[in-house]
């Protein structure tokens, strides 16, 4: 007979912890999916941005570079922020701030109005990976982390499918 059979409270608490683990993972995956969705849509929007505003590929390349450089700098900083303030807080702040930066980017009609919020979005996007990884490592044992990180990264891949699907739907259903 194992301890869980002789002590029913242990089995119940183990079971409820397991449910909490999966809830945390699904919440982190959902959040990370939308972090990636906020990044992926820019690439799909480039032809429309070029057509509407007359930006060159060079302009849009600089905007993408600003986002990626800010993202890289943010990766170096934000893991420490997650250690200091907690992964959940930092990841949540990043999601909200990235949403705001994406919203601001949507109003851009000049190159400077595009590159600034998109670059800032890169930093806010970097608030997703390291804090989410901290959450996962705090909740899951070392033996389970490979599977769990695989699921976490799978959410990023799903973002590409979601982004492309949403763009296709909006392109085929818009009235103009």
Q: What are these regions, as identified by a protein language model?
A:
Residues 36, 40, 106, 122-130, ...:
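Small-residue-rich segments within alpha-helical transmembrane domains of MFS-like 12-TM solute carriers
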Residues 2-37:
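Cytosolic juxtamembrane N-terminal segment immediately preceding the first transmembrane helix
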Residues 40, 68-76, 160-161:
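Residue-level signature of mid-helix packing/kink "hotspots" within the transmembrane helices
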């Amino acid at each position: 007979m194992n301890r869980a059979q002789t002590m029913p409270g242990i089995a119940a608490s183990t079971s409820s912890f397991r449910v909490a683990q999966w809830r945390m993972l699904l919440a982190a995956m959902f959040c990370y999916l939308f972090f990636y969705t906020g990044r992926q849509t820019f690439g799909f929007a480039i032809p429309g941005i070029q057509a509407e505003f007359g930006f060159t590929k060079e302009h849009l390349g600089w905007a993408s570079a600003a986002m990626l450089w800010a993202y890289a700098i943010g990766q170096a900083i934000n893991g420490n922020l997650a250690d200091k303030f907690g992964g959940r807080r930092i990841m949540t702040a990043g999601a909200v701030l990235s949403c705001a930066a994406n919203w601001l980017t949507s109003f851009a009609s000049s190159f400077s109005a595009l590159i600034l919020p998109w670059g800032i979005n890169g930093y806010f996007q970097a608030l997703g990976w390291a804090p989410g990884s901290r959450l996962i490592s705090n909740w899951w044992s070392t033996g389970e982390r490979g599977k769990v990180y695989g699921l976490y990264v799978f959410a990023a891949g799903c973002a590409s499918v979601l982004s492309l699907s949403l763009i296709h739907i909006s392109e085929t259903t818009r009235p103009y």
